[in-house]
């Protein structure tokens, strides 16, 4: 009796160094900003530790370290960043990138140690939520010549940043089809929402400003970006985050605002103005800001009312 021998084709398992774990980690995150930050911070770590880029072999070597040695390396890196005077938030962000790489590798079975016992530096939670006033922002809005393509576009962007407290990434990632003119609604990619678009309501004036810009739009088709570049080299392409930043910065300089203004500070200004207009109705303004935590808005409200400054004035009066 003869037995048939089945030949089974086998695939060799790729050695550890052939796994591009860093690339897999980056692809596991939706946010382009997160991917860029992780890539940059991990490159800085490997440059400090091995004087090399984080290529697969270097990462495989890092992931093969025993627990005690890995933690010792990270603690030395943390100390070196402190010695260079880096801010606590910067140190914590770089540690978070490295911890994320290790956690991801553990899930893949490519790492046996953990960095969860390495603690970040304590960061003061205060944030400067000041920006500009509605009166000064009206001056800024008067700058663009709305009878030109660039002026119509810039006016619409500035007004949208203020009225809807948008982040600049939320503004530039919108498409023509995301604007529902009849319903006065714009669908945006909100922070932390992946690829899910969220609706924001628009004022009549905002819809009119967007309609004025669309008459100049290089190619106002549904899938096209709502805001496009108008320079010769990038004509018709999606407007970049940096272009919006420069628009705000130069506009503030043109009206001699006297302080630095950025798209995010316009967002701060809009949220603060909304708190003023609603008598500090935090829950209502949360619908505008789309903050997930009320505590964040509470900081805006505290800064708006300046309770500490009020107490200082009382104490000063006690001195006569």
Swiss-Prot record:
Q: Name one GO cellular component term.
A: cytoplasm
One GO MF term, please?
DNA binding
Is the keyword Cell cycle assigned to this protein? yes
Keywords of the record:
Cell cycle, Cell division, Chromosome partition, Cytoplasm, DNA integration, DNA recombination, DNA-binding, Plasmid
In this chain the Tyr recombinase domain maps to 127-313
SUPFAM superfamilies xref list? DNA breaking-rejoining enzymes, lambda integrase-like, N-terminal domain
**Which compartments is it annotated to reside in?**
Cytoplasm
Q: Which Pfam families match?
A: Phage_int_SAM_1, Phage_integrase
Coarse class of the primary localization is cytoplasm
Q: Which InterPro entries match?
A: CB (IPR044068), DNA_brk_join_enz (IPR011010), Integrase-like_cat_sf (IPR013762), Integrase_catalytic (IPR002104), Integrase_recombinase_N (IPR010998), Integrase_SAM-like_N (IPR004107), Tyrosine_recombinase_XerCD (IPR050090)
Q: Would the keyword Oxidoreductase turn up in this protein's UniProt record?
A: no
Any stretches that span the bilayer, and where are they?
A: none
* Annotated ranges, domain Core-binding (CB): 16-106
User: What are its GO biological-process terms?
Assistant: cell division; chromosome segregation; DNA integration; DNA recombination
Q: Where is the active site?
A: 167, 193, 264, 267, 291, 300
Q: Which family does the entry's similarity section mention?
A: Belongs to the 'phage' integrase family.
> What function does this protein fulfil?
Site-specific tyrosine recombinase, which acts by catalyzing the cutting and rejoining of the recombining DNA molecules.
Please name the PANTHER family in this protein's record: PHAGE INTEGRASE-RELATED (PTHR30349), PROPHAGE INTEGRASE INTD-RELATED (PTHR30349:SF64)
Protein name per UniProt = Tyrosine recombinase Synpcc7942_B2651
């Amino acid at each position: 009796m003869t037995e048939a021998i089945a030949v089974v084709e086998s695939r060799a398992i790729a050695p550890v160094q052939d796994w591009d774990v860093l690339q897999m980690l980056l692809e596991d995150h939706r946010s382009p900003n997160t991917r860029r930050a992780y890539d940059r911070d991990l490159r800085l770590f490997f440059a400090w530790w091995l004087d090399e880029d984080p290529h697969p072999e270097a990462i495989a070597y890092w992931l093969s370290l025993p627990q005690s040695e890995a933690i010792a390396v990270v603690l030395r890196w943390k100390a070196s960043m402190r010695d260079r005077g880096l801010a606590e938030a910067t140190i914590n962000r770089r540690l978070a990138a490295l911890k994320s790489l290790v956690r991801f590798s553990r899930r893949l079975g490519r790492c046996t140690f953990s960095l969860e016992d390495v603690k970040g530096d304590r960061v003061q939670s205060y944030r400067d939520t000041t920006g500009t006033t509605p009166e000064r922002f009206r001056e800024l809005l008067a700058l663009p010549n709305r009878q030109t393509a660039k002026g119509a576009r810039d006016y619409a962007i500035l007004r949208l940043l203020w009225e809807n407290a948008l982040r600049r990434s939320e503004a530039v990632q919108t498409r023509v089809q995301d604007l529902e003119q009849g319903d006065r609604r714009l669908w945006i990619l909100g922070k932390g929402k992946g690829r899910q678009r969220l609706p924001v309501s628009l004022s009549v004036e905002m819809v009119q400003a967007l309609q004025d810009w669309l008459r100049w739009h290089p190619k106002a088709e549904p899938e096209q970006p709502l805001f496009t570049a108008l320079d010769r080299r990038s004509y018709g392409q999606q407007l970049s985050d940096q272009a919006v930043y420069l628009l705000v910065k130069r506009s503030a300089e043109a009206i001699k605002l006297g302080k630095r203004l950025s798209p995010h500070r316009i967002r701060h200004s809009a949220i603060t103005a909304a708190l003023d207009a609603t008598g500090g109705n935090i829950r209502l303004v949360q619908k505008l800001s789309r903050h997930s935590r009320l505590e964040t808005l509470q900081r805006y409200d505290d800064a708006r009312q300046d309770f500490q400054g009020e107490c200082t004035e009382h104490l000063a009066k006690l001195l006569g």
